[in-house]
């Protein structure tokens, strides 16, 4: 299976461990993230129009020094799945999605008619996030989550694609120990908006694994680690909480 994300740092987070999780689950999954930090759907569309070679080509969760256009990446191989998402601070602002979302998906459908198209539903910011875009939601996590649910639902319906429910599962895990941040638990964000390098990236990759690859994360032995946190030790009980929440949500919602 070959998965391409037309994305930004939030799809970078989602794909960091996806290939490794798939390998551990005995699945042949290749991933590519087209990365521009903070890239909106409007900018993606403008980059398509201009055939701009501005995207870092991140294969199987790894950075590279290769930069490509969306057209070059699409034409490179036969993708099984192609995803796109809105930039996080606009994720709950419905007016920012279209017409760009519709134009992107129409272009990709014409270019790659055999690929299955999906939309990646991203997550709300941490309750104390200092991101400037949080003000659009009155600095309220629940308000941001509800807004992005509405916006992603409408956008996905407008282009007739299913949703990868990362934002839903993140919000679910935030209600379970040890991830209840407002009670002193672990935040699933590393800086108030990007997802935690270990637990958060694992969570979102697990959602993609179950949703797109048909895997069962409960049976998967992969344990995340990163050179960015060389001394970090993953708590197996915390990981088990994530796995259970992901599987419960995805097995019920993603069949």
Model-assigned labels for residue ranges:
Residues 185-255:
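Conserved catalytic region of serine esterases and O-acyltransferases that act on ester linkages
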Residues 58-63, 131-132, 229-233:
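Intrinsically disordered, low-complexity coil segments
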Residues 67-197, 210, 219:
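Alpha-helical cap/lid subdomain in secreted, periplasmic
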Residues 2-4, 10-98:
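Conserved SGNH/GDSL esterase-like catalytic core that processes O-acyl groups on lipids
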Residues 11, 15, 101, 145-149, ...:
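A structural signal for well-ordered alpha-helical scaffolds and beta->alpha junctions
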């Amino acid at each position: 299976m070959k998965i391409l994300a037309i994305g930004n740092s939030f799809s970078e987070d989602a794909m960091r461990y996806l290939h490794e999780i798939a390998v551990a689950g005995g699945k042949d999954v290749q991933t590519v993230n087209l990365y521009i930090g903070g890239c909106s759907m409007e900018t993606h569309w403008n980059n398509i129009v201009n055939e701009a070679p501005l995207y870092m080509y991140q294969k199987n969760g790894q950075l590279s020094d290769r930069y490509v256009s969306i057209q070059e990446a699409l034409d490179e191989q036969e993708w099984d799945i192609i995803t796109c998402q809105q930039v996080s601070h606009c994720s709950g602002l419905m007016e920012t999605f279209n017409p760009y979302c519709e134009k992107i998906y129409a272009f990709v459908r014409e270019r790659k008619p055999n690929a299955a198209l999906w939309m990646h539903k991203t997550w709300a910011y941490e309750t104390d996030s200092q991101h400037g875009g949080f003000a659009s939601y009155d600095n309220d996590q629940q308000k941001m989550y509800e807004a992005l649910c509405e916006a992603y639902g409408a956008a996905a319906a407008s282009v007739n694609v299913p949703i990868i429910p990362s934002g839903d599962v993140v919000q679910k895990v935030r209600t379970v120990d040890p991830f209840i941040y407002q009670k002193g638990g672990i935040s699933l964000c590393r800086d108030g908006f990007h997802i935690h390098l270990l637990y958060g990236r694992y969570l979102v990759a697990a959602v993609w694994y179950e949703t797109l690859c048909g895997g069962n994360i409960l049976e998967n032995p992969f344990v995340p680690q990163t050179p960015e946190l060389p001394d970090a030790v993953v708590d197996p009980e915390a990981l088990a909480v994530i796995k259970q929440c992901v599987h419960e949500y995805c097995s019920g919602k993603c069949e």
